[in-house]
């Protein structure tokens, strides 16, 4: 999906205080767009946004969107929200967070982390690794990353590192270059009609990874194993504690502030390697 955006647009985020919405709004602001939003109360996220000169309305009222030309709505917002209803009455373009996220990263090489659990931790680890390289990626995470002291950062390179939210199915709009699937659990059944439908979304997402990219799927999760069986796109590696994983973690030792482990790597047509860390 390609969303045409002009710098004159006023983009209003309904539910801007959410961790994912606040990060996306920050990136849009730093890209030069006019950004505002609303939430039911102030929190740490809205306070960070105010420091970036992003206007935040406390409470949801139809008057909040008087100047808005585009609406981005959180998956937590109910259908009877007065701002959402007024936006529909005004026939304003309305997008889910995932749709807008997909639009701003569509021209970048990206790493997209999806799954029911562990997304934020995984995204944070990848982002922190990139922070120690010469690559300066755009980062949008579901939690504070210590290395940037924020949930999001606009980078100068053509790389993006993203945490994608599966709660409303909008992650399917994101075109992944590299994807990481942590696990799939029985969640968000208010949106998905069944586990079968939830699994189908993940299958469709992984199948979109191009031949020059790659997916990395945790083999420790039983639903991920079912995911693999249904994939048309076999361009993936597996990881985890499972001995059949391409990247297998062994001999784990946990200490107070760090862990040690051996990493066994077995790739098709490659010699087995063991990295001790």
Over which residues does each language-model region extend?
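Short linear motifs in intrinsically disordered
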Residues: 37-39, 143-144, 149-151, 246-255
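Short, ordered loop/turn segments at secondary-structure junctions
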Residues: 40-41, 61, 99-100, 241
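Phosphate-binding loop of NTP-binding sites
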Residues: 2-4, 27-33, 50, 63-64, ...
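A short, glycine/Asx- and small/polar-enriched loop/turn
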Residues: 66-68, 156-158, 255-259
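ATP-dependent carboxylate-amine ligase
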Residues: 1-57, 67-71, 87-92, 124, ...
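Active-site-flanking structural segment that lines cofactor/substrate pockets
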Residues: 36, 106, 262-265
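Adenine nucleotide phosphate-binding catalytic loops in nucleotide-utilizing enzymes
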Residues: 3-10, 14, 49-50, 74-75, ...
């Amino acid at each position: 999906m390609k969303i045409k955006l002009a710098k004159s647009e006023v983009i209003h985020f309904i539910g801007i205080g959410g961790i994912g919405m606040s990060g996306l709004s920050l990136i849009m602001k730093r890209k030069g767009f006019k950004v505002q939003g609303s939430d039911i109360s102030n929190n740490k996220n809205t306070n960070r946004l105010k420091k970036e000169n992003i206007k935040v309305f406390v409470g949801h009222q139809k008057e909040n969107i008087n100047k808005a030309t585009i609406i981005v709505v959180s998956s937590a917002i109910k259908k009877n929200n007065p701002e959402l209803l007024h936006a529909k009455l005004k026939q304003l373009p309305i997008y889910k967070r995932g749709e807008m996220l997909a639009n701003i990263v569509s021209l970048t090489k990206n790493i997209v982390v999806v799954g029911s659990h562990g997304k934020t931790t995984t995204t944070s680890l990848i982002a922190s690794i990139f922070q120690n390289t010469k690559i300066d990626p755009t980062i949008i995470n579901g939690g504070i990353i210590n290395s940037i002291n924020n949930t999001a950062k606009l980078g100068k390179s053509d790389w993006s590192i993203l945490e994608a939210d599966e709660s409303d199915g909008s992650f399917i709009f994101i075109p992944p270059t590299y994807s990481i699937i942590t696990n799939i659990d029985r969640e968000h059944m208010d949106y998905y009609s069944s586990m079968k439908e939830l699994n189908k979304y993940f299958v469709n997402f992984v199948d979109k990874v191009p031949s020059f990219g790659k997916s990395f799927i945790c083999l420790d999760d039983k639903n991920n194993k079912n995911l693999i069986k249904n994939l048309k796109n076999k361009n993936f590696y597996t990881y985890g504690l499972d001995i059949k994983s391409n990247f297998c973690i062994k001999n784990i030792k946990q200490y107070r502030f760090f862990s040690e482990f051996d990493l066994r790597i077995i790739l098709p047509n490659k010699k087995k390697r063991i990295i001790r860390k």
